[in-house]
Amino acid sequence: MDYIYTPKLHIKMKIQFDVLRKSRELILKELEGLTLDQIHVTPEGFKNNIAWNVGHVVVTQQVLHYKMSGLNCLCPDDLINDCKKGTSPTKTFTEEEFDEVKDLLMGLPDTLEEDFEAGIFENYDEYPTSTGLVLDSLETAIVFNNFHEGIHYGIIRAIKKFV
């Protein structure tokens, strides 16, 4: 679906970028005080751990926004393979590796907004989500991604109670 860039669309999207940045800040805050061992614990009743969830939100945002627009993702392929939809934790991050994931977590929202404003997203491959929603534009993908990150923020908070 083609969208005409208008000031009204810009304002609505600015709010979405702000929501994305805020969700990332909240996720990062949940990591405070946790050890490397704690973020890799998968409590009974859960399918994944905190480290995987953090990697997953980074990867999903990149796949939904960049890959589905026919562009290269801005995170490493290894991270995508380890944390994409349908995977479970197999990777144990070193402190340095997880710091890199946290840097991506916090830096990529600004890059997305800059790229959006620069108009690099010219195409979007329709994507049916597992929720039944069909993403047909970058704008709908950004809104959906914010919903998705809220889910994983809640999962991180729940796991944190058990580690």
Segments the model singles out, each with a brief description of its role:
Residues 86-124, 140-145:
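Acidic/histidine-rich alpha-helical segments that form the ligand environment
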Residues 1-12:
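N-terminal amphipathic/basic-hydrophobic helices that include classical n-h-c signal peptides
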Residues 20, 24-27, 31, 105, ...:
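Hydrophobic alpha-helical core bundles mediating ligand binding, dimerization, or RNAP-core interactions
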Residues 2, 17-21, 28, 38-85, ...:
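Short, contiguous alpha-helical
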Residues 33-40, 114-125, 161-163:
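Surface-exposed helix-capping loop/turn segments at secondary-structure junctions
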Residues 34, 48, 93-96, 136:
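Short coil/turn linker and secondary-structure boundary residues
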Residues 10, 17, 21, 54, ...:
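Generic detection of long, well-ordered alpha-helical segments
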